[in-house]
UniProtKB/Swiss-Prot annotation:
Organism placement in taxonomy: Bacteria, Bacillati, Chloroflexota, Chloroflexia, Chloroflexales
Protein family: Belongs to the HypA/HybF family.
Keyword Metal-binding: yes
NCBIfam families the record matches: hypA (TIGR00100)
Residues in coiled coil: none
UniProt GO BP: protein maturation; protein modification process
Organism this protein belongs to: Chloroflexus aggregans (strain MD-66 / DSM 9485)
Keywords of the record: Metal-binding, Nickel, Zinc
Name listed for the protein in its UniProt record: Hydrogenase maturation factor HypA
């Protein structure tokens, strides 16, 4: 379960940011996770609660924005969101699309203080 190591890294980064900002508590952590990032959101939430114990994030809410897979279709010459991230074919023309624009993100976007 690599989500636990990801959760520990999030807690470490956020704790350092809190210390740098001079705040003692973080109330929310905002993440963006792409559909291809290989992270299970529920497992990350569970792991985050464990990793945050005894830290400035102990009571923080983990808010996750799930990012769909967006690819560039050279045939249509446009970016398209894939309805099924396992099929890399344009939903409009049916041609294969290999250039991933979005969907691999794993980003700490923002921290919120009380």
């Amino acid at each position: 379960m690599h989500e636990l190591s990801i959760a520990h890294n999030i807690v470490n980064i956020a704790s350092a940011a809190a210390a740098e900002a001079g705040t003692e508590e973080i109330s929310a952590v905002y993440l963006r996770i792409g559909a291809l990032a290989g992270v299970v959101a529920d497992a990350l939430r569970f792991s985050f609660a464990i990793a945050a114990e005894g830290t400035p994030l102990a009571n923080a809410e983990l808010i996750i924005e799930e990012v769909p897979v967006t690819v560039f279709c050279p045939t249509c010459n446009t970016e398209v969101t894939l309805p099924n991230p396992r099929l890399f074919r344009c939903p409009h023309c049916g041609r294969p699309c290999g250039q991933i624009i979005h969907g691999r993100e794993l980003e700490l976007v923002a921290l919120e203080t009380p």
